[in-house]
């Protein structure tokens, strides 16, 4: 590949990155062409295809405009993934090392009101109905701020002494910790020791009305 072509390819990658950060969604092929001075949409498609093969972007075949810059793409551009991107670290499940950023399955545009938290944020997908009374449903994604302590009443992600990650409301009581579900049919978890991984500060629900 010529240096000119490679430079144009990186211009395409940077425009995709900048548009997603600015608007929260990727540009159209025509918008990419206009931004990097390419009149041929087939040429733009060619650059997009090569960027995907390099692992710099990923496309969702079920969504026509779903283009995301990958961690490798961020590195190629020399930009940080924060504060504009939150790593999505999978599901709250037993025994998983969910706080390793290299385990990120995706990246999510950070809401403007949470930008001050910067790289201290991550997202997890909730499995189960233990928090339905406060509107956290099965399949929701929660935005979590990394912290190792919590105040009574905080909604947290914690690692229990059975090495299971869970989302509950936190209470420090006389001689134990109580992890309280927000579901009237479920009992609290009582623990002698608990490891706080972070405090839930936001929620995202992917809803499609047809």
Swiss-Prot record:
A Gene Ontology BP annotation from the UniProt entry: DNA replication
Domain of life of the native organism: Bacteria
Catalytic activity annotation: Hydrolysis of Ala-|-Gly bond in repressor LexA
GO function terms (MF aspect): DNA binding; serine-type endopeptidase activity
EC number: 3.4.21.88
Annotated site residues (Cleavage) in this chain: 94-95
Record CDD domains: HTH_ARSR (cd00090), S24_LexA-like (cd06529)
Cross-referenced InterPro entries: ArsR-like_HTH, LexA, LexA-like, LexA/Signal_pep-like_sf, LexA_DNA-bd_dom, LexA_repressor, Peptidase_S24_LexA, Peptidase_S24_S26A/B/C
Annotated keywords: Autocatalytic cleavage, DNA damage, DNA repair, DNA replication, DNA-binding, Hydrolase, Repressor, SOS response, Transcription, Transcription regulation
Active site feature: 130 (for autocatalytic cleavage activity), 168 (for autocatalytic cleavage activity)
DNA-binding region, residues: 29-49
Family membership noted in the UniProt record: Belongs to the peptidase S24 family.
NCBIfam families according to UniProt: lexA
Its biological purpose: Represses a number of genes involved in the response to DNA damage (SOS response), including recA and lexA. In the presence of single-stranded DNA, RecA interacts with LexA causing an autocatalytic cleavage which disrupts the DNA-binding part of LexA, leading to derepression of the SOS regulon and eventually DNA repair.
Assembly notes: Homodimer.
Protein's name according to its UniProt entry: LexA repressor
Lineage of origin: Bacteria, Bacillati, Bacillota, Bacilli, Lactobacillales
